[in-house]
A protein has these predicted regions:
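Structured, active/binding-site neighborhoods that engage oxygen-rich ligands
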Residues: 1-166
């Protein structure tokens, strides 16, 4: 992943690893890894606000942490996923994940981080003909891990920027 910082303009550029995690050169960041679970569900044409789609996304996030080798997980997202990962195969995982995110928000009042936004890009491409469906999808997916309404608002705006640009 590419992180902020100065890079000297000498020599031949090369792909670097590192960043905020122990990434190999060319390895995707944790946020990109998570966005692939959203993309897999979106690629089916599913309504990303539906219980079934959100359950599949939430299940994917949990599989990523438990089984697929998450290379790094943000502190807030880790706390939410850890609260539900053991019940990932039971029905209603998305509702339990949203409840865990809401509980964390109630306890800390500090859950407006950028994690939901970092994996939101794909959502802006899913309903190009419907800004309201795009907004609802962005908020629904964001709320799986980020209960602060500002996090959802940022995802709605970001998804709409992408949708309208396309």
């Amino acid at each position: 992943p590419y992180e902020p910082g100065d890079i000297p303009f000498t020599g031949t550029p090369e792909l670097l690893g590192g960043g905020f995690g122990d990434y190999a050169p060319g390895e995707w960041s944790d946020d990109t890894q998570m966005s692939l679970y959203i993309a897999r569900v979106a690629a089916t044409g599913a309504d990303l606000t539906s219980r079934e789609a959100l359950d599949e996304i939430a299940r994917g996030f949990c599989r990523w942490v438990a089984l697929d080798g998450a290379s790094d997980v943000g502190v807030q997202t880790r706390r939410v996923l850890d609260a539900v990962v053991d019940s990932r195969d039971e029905p209603g995982i998305a509702a339990r994940m949203r409840a865990a995110a809401a509980d964390l928000d109630a306890a800390t009042r500090r859950t407006g981080g950028n994690g939901a936004l970092m994996r939101n890009g794909i959502v802006g491409l899913t309903r190009l003909d419907d800004r309201w469906a795009t907004a609802a999808s962005a908020r629904a997916v964001a709320e799986l891990t980020h209960a602060d309404p500002l996090a959802g608002d940022c995802c709605v705006i970001h998804a709409e920027m992408i949708r309208s640009a396309v």
